Design a protein with these regions (language model features):
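N-terminal export leaders
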Residues: 1-10, 15-16
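Secreted/extracellular ectodomain signature
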Residues: 20-143
């Protein structure tokens, strides 16, 4: 009886461990997907988001991951031409990272497309874009 109980406990542990195991990244050529939220006015947060994007790209390889940074609210200032992060954001775009601007925020803050860094993508609502990406299997990070 004790032996049978011990065997069942061991089997349960093995099955539970297998069920809880995280899937490996980049399995069989599967492309990874990441969406980053930037909604703060702090340059430190912008730099953190850009660092996260670059680190993920470096770790997985640019051809193995789709990365999107969605800027809305006060975070929209990160992707303006006069931003302190301008050169880093431009580098990210050149490296294949999608940078997305929320048109709701732009309208509310009276920001035009001519104020935004070249190469940005525009969506009607930043939060809805993040929701869409999550439903498409993107991992979500808010630095």
């Amino acid at each position: 009886m004790l032996r049978r109980t011990a065997s069942l406990a061991f089997l349960s542990t093995v099955l539970l461990t297998a069920a809880c195991a995280q899937p490996a990244l980049n399995v069989a050529g599967k492309r990874q997907k990441l969406v980053l939220q930037v909604s703060d006015a702090e340059a430190a947060k912008w730099n953190l988001a850009l660092n996260n994007a670059k680190n993920v790209q470096d770790e997985l390889g640019a051809s193995n991951v789709d990365i999107e940074i969605v800027a809305y609210g006060p975070g929209i200032n990160m992707i303006k031409f006069d931003s302190v992060a301008n050169s880093r954001v431009s580098e990210a775009i050149k490296a294949g990272i999608s940078v997305v601007a929320c048109e709701n925020t732009m309208r509310n803050l009276k920001i035009s497309r001519s104020d935004i860094i070249t190469g940005a993508i525009y969506v009607p609502a930043g939060v809805v874009q993040i929701m869409r990406r999550q439903s498409e299997g993107y991992a979500y990070v808010r630095p």
